[in-house]
């Protein structure tokens, strides 16, 4: 495992606190000693915490918080971590080859847990996988600086057409094979409510994590 990497965890603290605390606990366990910088809107206990205050949630503020964490890191590589993702020890043991590439795992599933929706594991499209990225620090900072404006914060969830481009947009990116899938939740408290819960490839069970009900019981 390369030690020249920092996990940057960023959150608006709007998910259910008990749920997010479970996410943080397993993240800390799976990090296996990799340094963590957390950037939050309320104080949390995870690595070196930077609390920016309750600036509101939006895609703009999400990337600003990430930028603040990346600027504070000193490592060559950054592993992104979000407050509604389940990663694994395998994920944080990945060793990047190049600094100017966004590396993301091939097997990533969304689990919708919203009311009145079908609860299944749904394969996640490549362009939505920023929260699984491992990338060179300088390349990531360049991407963020090109997206963000002069305003420090812009609260308020944007409409889909007004959201900032995805980090992968027109960037070098590579998908790599992972044996343990990464899981991201779509909850009623989440910023992104859009999900195709009628996806023809939705499944009820995935390796390592188990069934939909297993995961819901463990984390929700």
Where are these regions (language model features)?
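Active-site-proximal specificity loops/subdomain of glycosyltransferases
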Residues: 38-74, 91-93
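A generic structural signal for alpha->beta connector loops
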Residues: 4, 33-34, 46
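Short, acidic, metal-binding catalytic loop of nucleotide-sugar glycosyltransferases
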Residues: 21-34
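The conserved acidic donor/metal-binding loop of glycosyltransferases
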Residues: 82-86
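Conserved catalytic core of nucleotide-sugar-dependent glycosyltransferases
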Residues: 92-212, 216-219
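N-proximal low-complexity "stem/linker" segments adjacent to membrane-targeting elements
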Residues: 1-22
